Amino acid sequence: MLLKNCETDKQRDIRYACLFKELDVKGNGQVTLDNLISAFEKNDHPLKGNDEAIKMLFTAMDVNKDSVVDLSDFKKYASNAESQIWNGFQRIDLDHDGKIGINEINRYLSDLDNQSICNNELNHELSNEKVNKFSRFFEWAFPKRKANIALRGQASHKKNTDNDRSKKTTDSDLYVTYDQWRDFLLLVPRKQGSRLHTAYSYFYLFNEDVDLSSEGDVTLINDFIRGFGFFIAGGISGVISRTCTAPFDRLKVFLIARTDLSSILLNSKTDLLAKNPNADINKISSPLAKAVKSLYRQGGIKAFYVGNGLNVIKVFPESSIKFGSFEVTKKIMTKLEGCRDTKDLSKFSTYIAGGLAGMAAQFSVYPIDTLKFRVQCAPLDTKLKGNNLLFQTAKDMFREGGGQIILQRCHSRYSGHISLCCIRFGDFFCLKKMVYCQTGKDPEPTTRSGHSKQPGCTSNGCIQWNCRSFCCLSNQSFKNKTTSPRNICTSLCV
């Protein structure tokens, strides 16, 4: 069993001084927050680039709250932190051999999540995924551990067959010593009573994979959606969600196309009356109210679902192309960056992969989107309804410009879509980090079945303005030859 007090006070002071020297990048005996951030970058600490975590750590180190950490502050912090780290080490090191193996870390993290890894045969596949994730965390937290890796039972290996030897050379043979454990967790902030859990939460929060949901929404998931069952489930949910929101999409297209409607938020009724002296001031209302009345007079409730069938049709091909192209793009970016695995991709490369995947998916379904918009922009007094209107609109489009008209103005759509993917992902990530720093908990915990975690309504709402102008440009270009910024704002402000 490892003894806690195996080093003298003098040795401990020397070690503290050496650690503090690594953080004191300017060598003036004082460490500021900026110095600590620079030290993490210089020493290639696993939490480098995570300003929120470093700020929390600096606050804990600044014992006297003077915004500066000196050697005295650091010693007080380290002494208290090491006592907590030792107690945690003892709880994980069940065999008390002074070493922690990866399996012991797996069990501890699983207990924190109230999830079993080894004793659930029904979730064997999921368990393997969790073990692999914990293994990646082990490598992330202890990148320099290779020099200290030991293979247990090496003496007995000489007497065993090659098959037995290969069985023993597994992840379970990897371990870290208490010194390595202490040196890593000493520079990790403590939340919810566990530095290890905090470290794992940061690893999970900033090193997980990224995918795209329907309409190019960036989705963070535990592992890439696998299996035909998940694909079908995602498609069905997309069909339901699009059907539920079809009336809002119908109103959106109506307002974009009707450039003659003026917003009562941007203009006073007096100004609107001056432009149209014959109008009744009592009947001047919001464009949204006019849109609802006009559509209802056209065909009742059914009028709000015009074009929804095309929306439903494109769900499955769009999703399959999106996920497939995203994986292919990630592999290409992995080769360009020289990474061994897509998990090691930088966030910038993930942005690019997400944007390109969104563009590929949009390109594949753009003809359907174009046809849907034309159908929704049909004259209100038209006698054609349903499939007759759909087929007639398709024939008219083909006669007007053949295949070229299908891809007309698609560059505006692409510009808005790639910005939507990148901005939504960045905004969601920032908001998620803010929530985590305030609560110390993952704002969207992992589900056991591996279901995806989508950006919340706040992050979605914050960035819709950024890409909506591109959609207006694209859609109005089909309806009219010219588009003015005022018309775009009018369509947005109802």
From Swiss-Prot:
GO terms for cellular component: mitochondrial inner membrane; mitochondrion. It is found in: Mitochondrion inner membrane. The chain crosses the membrane at residues 231-248, 307-326, 355-368, 409-428, 458-475. Ca(2+) 2 binds at residues 93, 95, 97, 99, 104. The keyword Metal-binding applies. GO terms for biological process: ADP transport; ATP transport; mitochondrial transport. This is Truncated non-functional calcium-binding mitochondrial carrier SAL1-1.
